């Protein structure tokens, strides 16, 4: 039996804001002038058009960057911390399954389609592994749509949809921020962004994120070592036309996940399974602990299989790259907005993971996708 131990870490964060802060949601007219306290109006695009969350006739939940930072979230795998409707089953490497209200894919095979559609900056991600490692940085919001949502998002949205929406360049504004955090397990995290107004019609935004943390396990498995970059350019020659170009890159290079051997059951050919026998290993010992290897090589095999071989940290690793390019062209007409989004995304994944109860599993996976979306919204 394998148990993955999750350990919470205390985090101290420091934020330095340069210029004007970027708001994560638009506000309605300020009613405080009349002495009446008001609520912030949350704007969503869950139905492919800009509208207030209160007006959206759809079950949707939103999270802004402040909420995700305060929750100590490190990647998209941590979104379940903010929503009881969202369940995330983290497998070895980037093999992660997403469930919304209990509906999702029951396999972590990277070749299968997910039942939860995930869109990064308006671009559909064809594989869940393309979203599981997403660093949550410089985001305007994350939208969780509870399914089914096949009408707007296609057949792979039976369980629901997750939209990752980055902060976009802002015309006429020079601003930015730098945020750092330190915590247990030698955790050091940095993220920041800079918005630069090139002219009255052109603006660029550059943002990035890095995270380095020792493993929660004693053998340094369940660690983090990643960084991400994103650059955007916005061109608005007039009130009707806007063109935005974006490129992003993410890198993960660490040991990866690991489990603890907490005990064994004996399963004889005849009779019932025997009582549970504790391993005697300490919590968070990890799969490469000498005691775990002793049990692997001496207990965890049957006459039908060869004995397990010892594993060490060199047998476990993740080396993963995600790259994306996209453009978004919006043209306003008297009847509505015409939007065209061409995009290309690719991932190169080389990872090997293991647990006390099975041999190291190596995966080489290369994905690339080209998409074109044309829509008209009123």
Where would I find each of the regions flagged by the language model?
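Short, acidic/hydrophobic/Gly-rich beta-strand patch recurrent on exposed beta strands
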Residues: 101, 207, 341
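Glutamine-centric residue-chemistry signal
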Residues: 26-27, 47, 54, 149, ...
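Outer-membrane beta-barrel domain signature, strongest for Gram-negative TonB-dependent receptors
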Residues: 224-377
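Outer-membrane beta-barrel translocator/receptor signature
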Residues: 113-115, 127, 137-146, 151-229, ...
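Cleavable N-terminal targeting peptides that direct proteins into the secretory/outer-membrane pathway or into
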Residues: 1-34
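Short, well-ordered secondary-structure micro-motifs
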Residues: 111, 190, 255-257
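Structural signature of outer-membrane beta-barrel domains
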Residues: 49-51, 94, 105, 167, ...
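Acidic, small-polar-rich N-terminal luminal/periplasmic segments of exported/outer-membrane proteins
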Residues: 35-173
């Amino acid at each position: 039996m394998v148990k993955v131990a999750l350990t919470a870490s205390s985090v101290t964060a420091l934020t330095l804001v340069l210029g004007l802060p970027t708001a994560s949601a638009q506000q309605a007219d300020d009613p405080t002038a009349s002495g009446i306290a008001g609520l912030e109006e949350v704007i969503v695009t869950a139905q492919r058009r800009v509208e207030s969350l209160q007006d959206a006739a759809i079950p949707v939940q939103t999270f802004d960057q402040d909420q995700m930072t305060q929750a100590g979230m490190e990647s998209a795998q941590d979104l379940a911390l903010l929503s009881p409707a969202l369940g995330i089953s983290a497998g070895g490497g980037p093999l992660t399954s997403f469930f919304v209200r209990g509906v999702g894919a029951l396999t972590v095979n990277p070749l299968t389609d997910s039942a939860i559609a995930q869109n990064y900056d308006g671009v559909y991600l064809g594989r869940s592994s393309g979203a599981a490692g997403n660093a949550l940085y410089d985001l305007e919001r994350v939208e969780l749509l509870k399914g089914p949502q096949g009408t707007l998002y296609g057949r792979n949205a039976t369980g629901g949809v997750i939209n990752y929406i980055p902060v976009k360049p802002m015309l006429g504004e020079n601003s930015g921020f730098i945020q750092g955090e330190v915590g247990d397990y030698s955790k050091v995290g940095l993220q920041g962004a800079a918005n630069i107004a090139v002219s009255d019609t052109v603006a660029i935004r550059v943002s990035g994120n890095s995270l380095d943390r020792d493993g929660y396990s004693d053998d340094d498995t369940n660690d983090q070592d990643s960084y991400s970059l994103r650059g955007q350019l916005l061109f608005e020659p007039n009130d009707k036309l806007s063109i935005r170009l974006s490129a992003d890159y993410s890198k993960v290079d660490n040991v990866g996940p690991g489990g603890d051997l907490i005990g064994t059951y004996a399963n004889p050919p005849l009779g019932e399974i025997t009582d549970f026998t504790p391993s005697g290993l300490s919590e968070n010992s990890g799969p490469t602990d000498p005691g775990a290897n002793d049990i692997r090589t001496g207990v965890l095999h049957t006459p039908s299989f060869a004995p397990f071989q010892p594993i060490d940290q060199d047998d476990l690793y993740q080396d993963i790259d995600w790259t994306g390019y996209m453009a978004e062209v919006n043209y306003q007409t008297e009847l509505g907005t015409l939007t065209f989004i061409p995009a290309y995304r690719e991932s190169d994944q080389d990872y090997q993971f293991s647990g006390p109860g099975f041999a190291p599993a190596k995966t080489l996976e290369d994905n690339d996708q080209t998409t074109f979306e044309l829509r008209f919204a009123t």
